[in-house]
Amino acid sequence: MKNFHRSFLLGLLGLLFTSLAVAQKPAKPSAADLHQAIKKLNVLGSILYVAAHPDDENTRFISYCANEKYYNVTYLSLTRGDGGQNLIGPEMRDLLGVLRTEELLMARSIDGGKQRFSRANDFGFSKNPEETLGFWDKNEVLSDVVWAIRETRPDVIVNRFSHDRKYDTHGHHTASGMLSVEAFDLAGKADVYPEQLKYTETWQPRRQFYNTSWWFFGGQEAFNKMDKSHLFSADMGVYFPLKGKSNNEVAAEARSMHRCQGFGSLSTRGESLEWFDFIKGDRPQGQDIFEGINTSWSRVKGGEPIGALMAKIEQGFKSDNPAASVPDLLKAMQMIQQLPDGYWKTIKLAETKDVIRGCLGIYFDATASAPTTSPGQQVKVRLEAINRSALDVQLNALSIRPSLKDTTTAFALINNKGFILNTSITIPENAPYTAPYWLQKAATIGMYNVEDQLLRGVPETPRYATVRWMLTVQGIPIEYESEIAYKVGESSIGEVWRPFEVLPPVFVECTESSYIFSDKEKNVSIRLKAGADNISGTAGVQVPAGWVVSNVGDNTFNFKKKGEEKTFLFKVSAPSGPTEGELIPFARIGEKEHLMRLITIEYDHIPQQSVLQSAKVHASRADVRVSARNVGYYMGAGDDIPAALRQIGCNVTMLEDKDLDADNLAKFDAVVLGVRAYDTKDQLVFHQPALFEYVQKGGTLVTQYNTSFNANSPSLAPFPLKLSRQRVTDETAEIRLLLPEHQALNRPNKITSADFSGWVQERGLYFPTEWDQAFVAPLSMNDPNEKALDGALLVAPHGQGQFVYTGISFFRQLPAGVPGAYRLFANLISLGKEGEKP
């Protein structure tokens, strides 16, 4: 038998439990929840749903499988969505991937599904699967799909996207279908990825489908007219009496967790068909895609008596006395324990134990006295256990990890009489920091680097600090594990939970995300924050060879309390001529240098997340001149362009709705609207007259990309223009200067082809395809083998001023420190201005 123990120890994080993020707050299942969980104990079916990104999943189908069919249904998202946009905040790239991971986990906590990932990195929009698989390591991503199949053992695999090129919607989408179809046949072969078989076994699914939809066929009307006799269908509109909701209502709640993508959904009720196109395997004779699949206990050798007992438990369940089911549940648990090791034994044993705990009304609470700690530090921990039933429950022992602190209690958990233990643990000096495991090693543009096979696919890093509770119930031993978390009472909210995390003793960061140097030295400030009490050392900045750094004043720190901060100033100068490199701030404690910055991701719909990133920042020596001294910036969805503009000497004022009147705007040389401003700020449309009046009187207005527009206004501009979904995804695509003498390409910086080298992820997106003759288009670009797109940058005079609309991804380029992007953006905000400021 394979090493199922460690494999499932990690795998359960994503398979048996919805998410550790959700588990931070101890579960309190209702009688209806328990009744549904008992029904599930007697169903041994598994479904794997495969797509490319967070929010690609069909929450209606996932909820239907989990709550109507009682199957174990897992969503395999090949990426974590790092390359997308963010509608609710500034997180991009890796940080966006962390946010979208948590949104997926919250969605699964609602629809009842489980979650897995591959190591594929979302590098941004891709126009075809060949490009996608060129950036992804096809063999490695394919191995992850095979691993997911072997770990989840699906009877049926359902792909969100077709593997057929004629249905291309996005290269990642089509690639996900292609990889799933290939993996279907490979997962059952022992000579394919044999290294996985140290931990799991081969598995051959029964059949595979493509979850088709009207939006692949040009609309609902066209889909209604097409011949669907070859398709399979199922009604997703079923009603769940135990939930008091229809499946569609549950699905809408789950989909609405994808807030950073703007996918809040209205709930619907009534019949609603979902359609499936057969791909391979044994084709059902009827309409049921699960036809002929044995999902009873008889599929497990020796399991039939367990199925009979589970049926008895379900029939005899009493909602006003769930504990009455516990004696039979204990018998079922013991029968499962006697089965040979295997997938369903592990799954159903864990599910049965969870139901027993819920029926007993047992509550476990393990909370630390602080939300964070550091290696070597001692932390107070409060442990609470209570049994809210009349059954005999004994708490025999506790084991706290990682301190290996065991406590023998022999405490009788009498009905509603709680057990409380206040203790402390010491975090080992070699304890790993709490951080997303897939971000621990350097990644490529298309792949994350995860060496541990058993971590691959797990949604989150396993929590380091846990408590094992060793009980006997009616004389029968049973163990549970819970993570140590942190909770606090907030007067306006009540009980607030967050993860308990092990973090470095000190964090360090530059105060800017990138630096642009001229021929003058520049002030570089770094900020230190204590992650532990009583730490001291020195701060500094490492610079590239040929650069010069000197500290201004004392560079020592002596923090008495965790949370203290101190800022240090350094003078840095770059060598002459164009050059690029990295500035690396550090805090030295003894012989160890600490090089990490801490980013906290905090929204009310996900658990708070701490991410550790390298504190290094990009620095370049470039000739960037700007004539606009005073710039007003109206933030949209969130970006870091204001800080970038300050790097080149602009005085940036952040604008709110109340500031958008023509008289107030007159003091600015230029006004910039942040990315997706019209998408995210409903009031902005009402300020258009003032903005356009500002332009008429001599101002420069730069409007960055939007994806849609408020129907209350005919245009984003003083003149008509029509947005599209056209984009250039190749960041190295040739840029043609259509109007080389236009002021946007000449003053104050002469723009050449060299200014478009070193760009990141993409050139731009959502370019206009139609525009008024008042506009000129200075640039043209396109992805390989595609037609030229001239709408990336549009400039129009309006009265005495200049209006600019651009889909160029400045929001990615400026924070990345791309010199040419700085030079071009400086020209845009300087349109119509006299003089140059180096």
Show which residues each predicted segment covers.
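Aromatic-Pro/Gly-enriched surface loop or interdomain linker
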Residues: E593-G674, Y705, R812, S830-K837
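Long beta-sheet-rich domains in secretory-pathway and surface-associated proteins
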Residues: S369-S620, V626
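Bacterial N-terminal signal peptides
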Residues: L10-S19
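The feature marks non-catalytic terminal segments
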Residues: Q24-P26, D33, L186-Y363
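Bacterial N-terminal signal peptides that target proteins for export
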Residues: M1-L9
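Active-site beta-strand->loop->alpha-helix modules in alpha/beta enzyme cores, enriched
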Residues: Q24-Y193, W214-W215
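A glycine-rich, often tryptophan-bearing local segment used as a flexible ligand/cofactor-contacting loop or short
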Residues: R676-S757
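Catalytic beta-strand/loop cores that center a nucleophilic Ser/Cys/Thr
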Residues: R725-G817, E836-K837
